[in-house]
């Protein structure tokens, strides 16, 4: 699979993070979509069917843990990889992320 065939959804409420990370992923040839909150991230995930979702934990409204849980309960997204990309590095936050169905947990 070429990078251009690999679809990534980036979900973060910080515009600077969305811009920086999506720019660098696109520069490497990946197809990238973005969402600025959990609700729009879930909606885009259902429409876009990405291979990978990079998800922030701390977001207003539906946080990343709930978003991950909702994604995992959507059958057409069962093969999508989910990695939290977040400033929260505490053990309890990582455990909550993995319990919600995350495949990886990366601290910013």
State where each predicted segment sits.
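Charged docking surfaces used in two-component/phosphorelay signaling
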Residues: 19-27
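Short hydrophobic/Thr-rich beta-strand motif most characteristic of the beta2 strand and flanking loop
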Residues: 29-36, 44
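Acidic catalytic/metal-coordinating carboxylates
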Residues: 36-40, 63-66
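Short amphipathic alpha-helix used as the core "switch/output" element in two-component signaling
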Residues: 43, 65-78
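Active-site beta3 strand of CheY-like receiver
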Residues: 48-54
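Receiver (REC) domain active-site loop signature in two-component systems and cognate sites
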Residues: 59
């Amino acid at each position: 699979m070429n990078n251009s065939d690999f679809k990534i959804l980036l979900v973060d409420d910080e515009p600077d993070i969305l811009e920086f990370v999506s720019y660098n992923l696109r520069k490497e040839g990946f197809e990238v979509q973005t969402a600025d909150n959990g609700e729009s991230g879930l909606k885009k995930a259902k429409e876009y069917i990405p291979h990978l979702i990079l998800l922030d934990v701390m977001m207003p409204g539906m946080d990343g843990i709930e978003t991950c849980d909702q994604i995992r309960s959507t059958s057409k997204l069962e093969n999508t990889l989910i990695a939290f990309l977040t400033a929260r590095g505490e053990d309890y936050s990582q455990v909550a992320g993995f319990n919600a169905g995350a495949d990886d947990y990366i601290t910013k």
